[in-house]
Every structure is written in C-alpha cells, then in structure tokens.
C-alpha cells in the first residue's frame, strides 16, 4: 500500500557534485528524502547524460532499486542555451533534439516528469517571432512526450513570459494535452507581483509537483530560507486545502558548499517545520 505521507525531495544541485548516483541517492536517503530531482542544464557535462549508454542508464535504475530513493523528475534547463524560440534555425533544432533525447532518457530510466524552463529565448532579445517559435516548439515537444507517456511540466519562472500560473495555464489551454502540465516554484511565484494564493488555487488540477525555495524581488537563487518574501505556511495551507497531494522539492544550489549535507539538513528541518504548521506533515 502506498504511503499517505507527502513526498519530499531534494534537488541534485543541493548535494555534492559528481556522477555516482548510488552515492547521491544513499546520501539523500540518509538525509530523509523520498526522491532526488535530476538536473540537465546547459553545461556540456550534464547535457552528456542524454547520451548515456544503456549500461549507464541501467546503473541509475539499479541505484534507485537498491536505495529505494526515486528519481521521478528532471529539471531540464538546457533550453537556456538552446531555446525553442530561437530565430537561429540551427540552435532551435538543437533545442528540439535535446527535448527528444530528454524524453527518451526519461522513458528509459523511469523519470515521469520533465520540468521545462519557460523561456522563449534567454540570452537574446524576445519578440513576437520568438514567442511563436516557442509555442510551435512546445507543440512538437508535447507530441513527442505523448507518444512516450512522459509528462512535460512548465515551471513558473524568473522571466516575464512565464512568471505566473495564469500565464502557464494559457499554454496548457493552447496545447490542450494531458501530457503538458504545471510545475510551479513558490519562490518564483512570490517574487513577482502575483496574488500567490489565488494563483495556486487556479493551478489545481494541473500542478504535478512544487518547487520550494525562498526569493526576494529580483533575486531568484540562493536566498536562505526565512530571509525572503515567501509565505511558506500560507502556500502549503492553500495547496493542501485545494486538494494537492503531490510531491514537494526543496531547490538549493549548495553542491559547492563546504558541507552540502549540513546545509541541506538545515533547510530540510526549516521547511518541514513550516509544513507541520500548515498541517502537511506531523510535527517532529
């Protein structure tokens, strides 16, 4: 019987860097997490994962089986470098090929959700053409994901195109496909001028996972928990009352810290205390 406990995961970049997934999952288990979210970012090292051999993919599956710690989701931020909205046909084609490889990788290793970065372009100037190309690229991507039975889920971003659940829902309605859903980041959502609780309620029925981090207006990374603007207890209460029962993922970038495990444990305790206050988990 599946546990009724709220699944709590940790982002790969919060844990010590390296390519040994068995060690990473063992550490996550020691720290009390149910799952780890993989990062495939714009660096060559992490992009290379999409070209892993059959044996390398099987090693990840074996590590999950041995530890009991799942890798159910991938944060695919590589499209910053190879955006689907690029006006350069070669770059856009690379972006679509990355998407194809990511979906195939997910299918092979059991990843269920690929979180997408909501940028039409990132390092270039956006315009009507980049937005049109982005929409078309999403349509092609969702068609591929549908055939593979892998969910693509749009993150709420640090970027105006996709800085609210309402905007992401526009794409969900446009695509009208069950394999395209939403993966809000309550930090990013709170850093903009949004009615955060109304936005969370609007997304219910489409939210497949939630990123948990703190932010300040204009500062979207590395804000220590409790020092930003996010009202965590209210967000957790709203999600619970709205019927959301899915996973929460603590997003941190402490892989290069002096003691990443200690940083993660501190954040875990802080977040779980707020979850307990909101009635999501039992108090420690």
Curated annotation (Swiss-Prot):
It comes from the Bacteria. GO terms for biological process: L-ascorbic acid catabolic process; L-ascorbic acid metabolic process. Gene3D superfamilies: Divalent-metal-dependent TIM barrel enzymes. It is an enzyme of class 5 (isomerase). Pfam families: AP_endonuc_2 (PF01261). Pathway: Cofactor degradation; L-ascorbate degradation; D-xylulose 5-phosphate from L-ascorbate: step 3/4. Induction: Induced by L-ascorbate. Repressed by UlaR. It catalyses: L-ribulose 5-phosphate = L-xylulose 5-phosphate. This is L-ribulose-5-phosphate 3-epimerase UlaE. The lineage of its organism: Bacteria, Pseudomonadati, Pseudomonadota, Gammaproteobacteria, Enterobacterales.
């Amino acid at each position: 019987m599946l546990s009724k406990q709220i699944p709590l995961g940790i982002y790969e970049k919060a844990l010590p860097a390296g390519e040994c997934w068995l060690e990473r999952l063992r550490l996550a288990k020691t720290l009390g997490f149910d799952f780890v979210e993989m990062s495939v970012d714009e660096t060559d090292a992490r992009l290379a994962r999409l070209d892993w051999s059959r044996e390398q993919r099987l090693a990840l599956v074996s590590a999950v089986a041995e530890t009991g710690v799942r890798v159910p989701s991938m944060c695919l931020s590589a499209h910053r470098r190879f955006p689907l909205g690029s006006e350069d046909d070669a770059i856009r084609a690379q972006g679509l090929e990355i998407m194809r490889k990511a979906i195939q990788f997910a299918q092979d290793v059991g990843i269920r959700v690929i979180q997408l970065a909501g940028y039409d372009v990132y390092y270039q100037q956006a315009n009507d053409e980049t937005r049109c190309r982005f929409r078309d690229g999403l349509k092609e991507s969702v068609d591929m994901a549908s055939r593979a039975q892998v969910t693509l889920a749009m993150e709420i971003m640090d970027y105006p195109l996709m800085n609210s659940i309402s905007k992401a829902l526009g794409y969900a309605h446009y695509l009208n496909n069950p394999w395209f859903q939403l993966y809000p980041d309550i930090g990013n959502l709170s850093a903009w001028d949004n009615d955060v609780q109304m936005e969370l309620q609007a997304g219910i029925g489409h939210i497949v996972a939630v990123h948990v981090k703190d932010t300040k207006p204009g500062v979207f990374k590395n804000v220590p928990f409790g020092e930003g603007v996010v009202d965590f207890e209210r967000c957790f209460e709203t999600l619970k009352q709205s019927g959301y029962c899915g996973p929460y993922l603590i997003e941190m970038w402490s892989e290069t810290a002096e003691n990443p495990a200690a940083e993660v444990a501190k954040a875990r305790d802080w977040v779980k205390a707020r979850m307990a206050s909101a009635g999501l988990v039992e108090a420690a």
